[in-house]
């Protein structure tokens, strides 16, 4: 039955491989169930309701991904988009969270229309092959950066980022939590790399679990001491089961009356959500598909329409349930690295999101320094694509360099793509190669430039 549904043999995979990939993807992104309520509740939304809405919307989106495209991508509430929702729309602009949810709903519906009319597919295919490679490499750099941040190997400093100091940690009392977490993360990275070299199946998942277990042992021995003020909690689950929170406080909470009286301002908010959602999704899909060799010889992804439609439907459903924009997660690459090639990986991740509603005390105990090693190693694997960039052709190579570096520097996939597009187009025009740029590329470049003055 599973063979008929997901064409496993045709895609060179097995049920076991897909299940391991789905579990690995889930474990690397389960943090969103803790982080999304923390961010969105700043706007006044009920945290418990947000957690339930996020889990259910994520599961539905993952199931849609499997049904519409048979691809191994997982979806959940997008980071950056939830911060924009809470801190910009509801914070700086001062709009009620019901208005922000309405904007997400409208954005999702527009997204569905764009997907059904092949607009997003045209955008995907308009991106030059070299930039697609750069996007994959840039995402690798980006998620590795997220990994070292999550483990607090890199911390804020006078130079914007700096290395965690064990000496300072011992002096100020943070070593027993933050310092131990850094060491355990490093052990996790080394463990995953060794298992990768040895060809161990499920090395990402085993690396995460090993790091977590070592952390539990350290806590039992008094080496690791929880420090909630720094975000370091007990690694030992206090419970295994809990009943899901009601979504009633956020379900279908829209404010269409406000939209009618503030149409222009509302349109700007919708455009911001739509812009970031479209290009974050495209960037993630390009990066993950490129890593898994899913792109054809022309750099196009078969069944891209289904992938994009699943993302759009997920956003719409998420808004109805009461969460911010649902988008394809870059952590999907961890499952793909484990061999995930079909929608069975997505289904597995989706089921685990539903299970997490009842096992949230267990899943939420896994610390970020245990999942960080997986992100760092996946970043390394994705950056291997850098050899496919034509470095001898500066007109193509420099925009790729800009795209790669700006993803990390701007802490945004879509911003990296924007800088890559703009530099690619301008350099080709100035060097007399304007005819190599498609009309759609010119239009998108113009929109990227306009975006910097609107959002």
Task: Locate each region found by the language model.
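Juxtamembrane transmembrane-helix boundary signature
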Residues: 58-79, 110
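Membrane-embedded alpha-helical modules
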Residues: 93-213, 347-455
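Helix-loop-helix hairpins and the membrane-proximal interhelical loops
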Residues: 1-49, 166-167, 208-305, 449-450
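Residue-level signature of catalytic and energy-coupling elements of molecular machines
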Residues: 19, 39, 123, 202, ...
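Loop-to-helix transition at the N-terminal end of transmembrane alpha-helices
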Residues: 43-63
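Helix-loop-helix junctions within the multi-pass membrane cores of secondary transporters/permeases
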Residues: 2-36, 57, 78-87, 91-139, ...
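Hydrophobic/aromatic residues within the transmembrane alpha-helices of Major Facilitator Superfamily
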Residues: 23-30, 60-63, 67, 144, ...
